[in-house]
């Protein structure tokens, strides 16, 4: 018999406003503010209404120092948001190689998958990110992996019309 969901505590307006300022700190890259709050006991894996963690917001918006700060306080680098996306997939989508390097340095699985089975390599291929495709493959990403629908990185590049990564992946997989 399925268990009933746990009740969600009601939060007052002041608490909700404070939480939004915390998420804004991650979005804007305010690593000093994040560090202060984390040092006071704020959970490193705090998530907003969309399931975006502090790390997801910092990494998606390209704030490496803020991401490094949150990771230093134990943030889970593979925590998915409610859409099933990971920080690594977000960085691949945005084309942020330095963020990808940081996440991999902190133990992110290069083959980690989003809820739909897409890997960061597939995201990079879809959006014509040749430098990131090369880097991820060099770090062990499988260019023949398939997502939940059976699409490979090459198929994803074809579907999105990403000509450079199509050519790159054709050279790699034959």
What is the meaning of each model-derived region?
Residues 1-22, 106, 138-139, 148-151, ...:
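Ankyrin-repeat-protein effector appendages
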Residues 46-47, 77-80, 110-113, 145-146:
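Ankyrin repeat boundary signal
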């Amino acid at each position: 018999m399925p268990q009933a969901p746990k009740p969600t505590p009601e939060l007052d307006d002041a608490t909700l406003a404070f939480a939004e300022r915390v998420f804004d700190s991650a979005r804007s890259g305010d690593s000093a503010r994040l560090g202060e709050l984390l040092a006071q006991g704020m959970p490193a894996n705090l998530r907003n209404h969309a399931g975006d963690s502090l790390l997801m917001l910092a990494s998606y918006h390209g704030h490496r120092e803020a991401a490094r700060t949150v990771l230093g306080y134990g943030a889970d680098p593979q925590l998915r948001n409610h859409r099933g996306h990971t920080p690594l997939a977000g960085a691949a989508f945005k084309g942020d190689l330095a963020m990808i390097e940081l996440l991999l340095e902190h133990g992110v699985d290069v083959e980690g998958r989003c809820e739909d089975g897409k890997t960061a390599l597939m995201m990079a291929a879809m959006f014509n990110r040749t430098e990131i495709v090369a880097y991820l493959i060099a770090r062990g990403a499988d260019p023949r992996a398939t997502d939940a629908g059976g699409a490979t990185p090459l198929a994803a590049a074809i579907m999105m019309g990403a000509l450079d990564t199509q050519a790159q992946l054709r050279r790699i997989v034959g």
